[in-house]
UniProtKB/Swiss-Prot annotation:
Phylogenetic classification of the source organism: Bacteria, Pseudomonadati, Pseudomonadota, Gammaproteobacteria, Oceanospirillales
Keywords annotated in UniProt: Cytoplasm, DNA damage, DNA recombination, DNA repair, DNA-binding
Region annotation Domain II: where it falls in the sequence: 65-143
Cross-referenced NCBIfam families: ruvA (TIGR00084)
GO BP annotation list: DNA recombination; DNA repair
Name of the protein described by the UniProt record: Holliday junction branch migration complex subunit RuvA
Family recorded in the similarity comment: Belongs to the RuvA family.
GO molecular function: ATP binding; four-way junction DNA binding; four-way junction helicase activity
Role played: The RuvA-RuvB-RuvC complex processes Holliday junction (HJ) DNA during genetic recombination and DNA repair, while the RuvA-RuvB complex plays an important role in the rescue of blocked DNA replication forks via replication fork reversal (RFR). RuvA specifically binds to HJ cruciform DNA, conferring on it an open structure. The RuvB hexamer acts as an ATP-dependent pump, pulling dsDNA into and through the RuvAB complex. HJ branch migration allows RuvC to scan DNA until it finds its consensus sequence, where it cleaves and resolves the cruciform DNA.
Cell compartment(s), UniProt: Cytoplasm
Organism annotation: Hahella chejuensis (strain KCTC 2396)
UniProt region (Flexible linker), positions on chain: 144-152
GO CC terms of this entry: cytoplasm; Holliday junction helicase complex; Holliday junction resolvase complex
Span list, region Domain I: 1-64
């Protein structure tokens, strides 16, 4: 089991990053909510990881905080929820927000995420209720805008932001509309993604 990787951030192509650990490159899929916490290319990066072995592939999922990985693993225990959906959930809300959603039986918010239908959302509420009952939501770290990284330069940040939304399961028209709705001069890729996701959940 690979539980943690520490190395240099070699590539950043949401939702995937490439971590160079002593000359070995590890491709890791991360929730889009983690983008703002990643360092600049070439700088040191540490990720808590979850290793998945399938017949056709070996996959690594990375998380900035231990509690993100903890919730990811709890989500995988829910019937019908695989790694892709678990990453999508963590891309849209923090562990604290998800816990509040389950405790408040907020079915509507769950169904606003791509790939989460009513039946899946109902299973999440039912099966996760007992699993998160001891989750100390108030004591865990919460993401804040001040922690977000500086904007990534270059003309392709719009395309990269749109590609990240497509990877979550949104349709091209939805992704393009959401990006254009929040885009402003000087805005970086990570902020674009964060605001677009926030807007899509509110308006969907």
């Amino acid at each position: 089991m690979i539980g943690r990787l520490v190395g240099k951030l070699a590539e950043n192509h949401p939702p995937f990053v490439l971590l160079d650990v002593n000359g070995v490159g590890y491709e890791v899929e991360v929730p889009l909510s983690a983008l703002g916490y990643l360092p600049k290319l070439g700088e040191s990066c540490s990720l808590f990881t979850h290793f998945v072995v399938r017949e056709d592939a070996q996959l690594l999922y990375g998380f900035i905080r231990r509690e993100d990985r903890e919730l990811f693993r709890l989500l995988l225990k829910v019937n019908g929820v695989g790694p892709k959906m678990a990453v999508a959930i963590l891309s849209h809300m923090s562990p604290n927000e998800f816990v509040e959603c389950v405790r408040g039986d907020n079915l509507t918010r769950l169904t606003k995420m791509p790939g989460v239908g009513k039946k899946t959302a109902e299973r999440l509420l039912i099966e996760m209720r007992d699993r998160i009952k001891d989750w100390g939501a108030g004591d865990r770290e919460t993401a804040t805008p001040e922690l977000l990284s500086q904007a990534v330069g270059g003309h392709s940040h719009l395309e990269e932001a749109e590609a990240a939304l497509l990877a979550l399961g949104y349709k091209p028209q939805e992704a393009s509309r959401a990006i254009n709705a929040v885009n402003k001069d000087g805005m970086g890729r990570d902020e674009l993604i964060r605001l677009a996701l926030k807007g899509m959940v509110k308006t969907k």
